[in-house]
């Protein structure tokens, strides 16, 4: 039965990617974006281990384009996340101050002892939270001071990526948009969860890219790459787009949408194709040279989980850009009536 329904099977939960022969990694844009949120130590571990393992890396053209467009936003966004962390803890002081003001307004001497106790509690909480923030989040800002022209992460990404796909011309994009309308109506993945984006678009090099088809464009470029893969090659698509048009949620464990694996297999039946989420991938790469039971390995796993779960919701001057490119960090566990 496995031969007929291979799209429902995966060996990845029991295999370390370092043990896969003839492996090619294809990264979605969000994988590069998350690198900016790790501290310098984790960044170094990622790039060092990727080089040591000799992984072959390919990215579709539109992954590279989205990364270049959003890179400056991500550098700014790291500071925004740190500011949100600071504001969250400052809100504790605000609540305590409001409580004290409300109690003091009664002007009752009997409440003096209570007010003194609240002030003492406020001081203790403030000291405790300040120490916690200092120990855990002070280095959360861009530790290596990336700026637009001096970006160490981009330099290492440039060195890491072996191959970048070619762009689609306007005629090819029009075909994808037309085909995309039909796929979206039939809930064929990927991208139908982005149909609500309407006809918003952006331009690059004189070419119009419609936002709601962003995932589909990248997927078509992945399929184009698969056409020319060698027999026996194992291609792993790594993405943290967790919407239900990429993954199916089974008991809190995400498995690749069977339709995507089936479509990949229909393009090239002589290769192995699978998908992996960002947290699984970063865990395997960043701790590959550590004792899996060590404190350092556990600390790395914890930081990966915290970083992946950071909800990036920029505001003020960054809000417009966030809305324009919100596909980069999209989460959606709501299962729909897919084709499977």
Regions found by a protein language model. Name each.
Residues 2-235, 243-339:
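Active-site-proximal, substrate-binding regions of enzyme catalytic domains
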Residues 239:
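Short beta-strand/turn micro-motifs composed of small residues
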